[in-house]
């Protein structure tokens, strides 16, 4: 047993040393890096940067609000349990003195910035636990023109709604893997294309957990594969206010989930959908304690009648982007000389 633990420790150490060696920029609060704050590291990247810049962030509690204003950046934490970015910001409070949402989150991605990756980090907006208000508070916020965003092996948490708000309605493409998401109403709420797999969700509200806006393209979709959903007793799965399309494949729901299908929520003034309310598809999804009829298999009702094996990154993003290939290339840089 001791040999196994020692081998595991050595493998972790080797992986850490390789990431450290391959990083373009190192952030360390103890002064043993290029910068002691993440924002200073981000600011050091050239505006003309066209290749991925790997910023390695050593363990620490980073009480920072981040503004990402350059493309092609990879933020890699030493360990998601101990590399923590935390800041308290309430959206409505921010908007009292600011014209838009840029700056309302912990991580703020400027319009038209592309190709950003977050790996092995905790990102948390803790306004609610500090001040008792669980209204909208972003952990990550992005808007127009922001696309090709990867979140891998991360905890993304907010003490309010809209935890992960990637809102490029035109053609946003987002991929999240092996993550934990937590929040209140609509806490994972992409616009455009989004693919999440091998991840866990925890919701604290009785309104909705996931949300989607696919109103500008009939092919926009929110796909969740091999995910686990949990929350407070009676938590609902999801809703949408505009045209949307959900695919849930091989997902598991805790017994706390309410008997309430993903629903079209009313707006004022009322919205008329272009493609109908029924574009919510399931395959092999089950609830602990017993299934509800509304999440039975119905993939054959989707346009093109896709089979489960067909639902991969290339299919989801229409062959425009394969984030799993990108992620593997990034990780290969960490282990090239292992």
Roles of regions detected by a PLM:
Residues 24-32, 36-338:
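Sequence-level preference for short, compositionally simple segments enriched
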């Amino acid at each position: 047993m001791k040999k196994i633990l020692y081998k595991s420790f050595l493998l972790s150490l080797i992986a850490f040393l390789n990431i450290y060696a391959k990083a373009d920029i190192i952030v360390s609060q103890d002064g043993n890096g290029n910068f002691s704050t993440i924002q200073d590291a981000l600011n050091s990247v050239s505006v003309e940067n066209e290749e991925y810049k790997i910023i390695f962030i050593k363990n620490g509690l980073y009480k920072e609000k981040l503004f990402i204003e350059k493309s092609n950046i990879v933020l890699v934490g030493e360990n998601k349990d101990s590399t923590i970015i935390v800041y308290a910001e309430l959206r409505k409070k921010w908007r009292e003195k600011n014209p838009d949402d840029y700056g309302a989150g912990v991580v703020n991605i400027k319009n038209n910035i592309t190709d950003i990756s977050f790996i092995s980090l905790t990102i948390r907006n803790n306004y609610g636990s500090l001040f008792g208000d669980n209204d909208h508070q972003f952990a990550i916020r992005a808007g127009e023109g922001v696309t090709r965003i990867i979140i891998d092996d991360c905890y993304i948490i907010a003490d309010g709604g809209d935890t992960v708000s990637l809102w490029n309605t035109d053609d946003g493409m987002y991929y999240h893997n092996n993550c934990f998401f937590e929040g209140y109403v609509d806490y994972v709420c992409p616009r455009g294309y989004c693919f999440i797999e091998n991840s866990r969700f925890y919701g604290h509200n009785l309104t909705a957990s996931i949300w989607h806006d696919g109103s500008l393209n009939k092919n926009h979709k929110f796909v969740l594969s091999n995910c686990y959903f949990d929350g407070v007793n009676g938590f609902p799965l999801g809703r949408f206010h505009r045209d949307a399309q959900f695919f849930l494949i091989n997902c598991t729901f805790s017994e706390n989930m309410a008997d309430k299908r993903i629903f079209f929520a009313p707006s004022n003034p009322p919205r008329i959908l272009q493609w109908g309310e029924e574009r919510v598809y399931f395959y092999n999804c089950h609830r602990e304690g017993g299934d509800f009829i509304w999440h039975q298999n119905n993939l054959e009702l989707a346009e093109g009648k896709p089979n489960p094996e067909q639902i991969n990154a290339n299919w989801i993003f229409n062959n425009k982007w394969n984030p799993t290939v990108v992620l593997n290339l990034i990780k290969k840089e960490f282990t090239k000389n292992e």
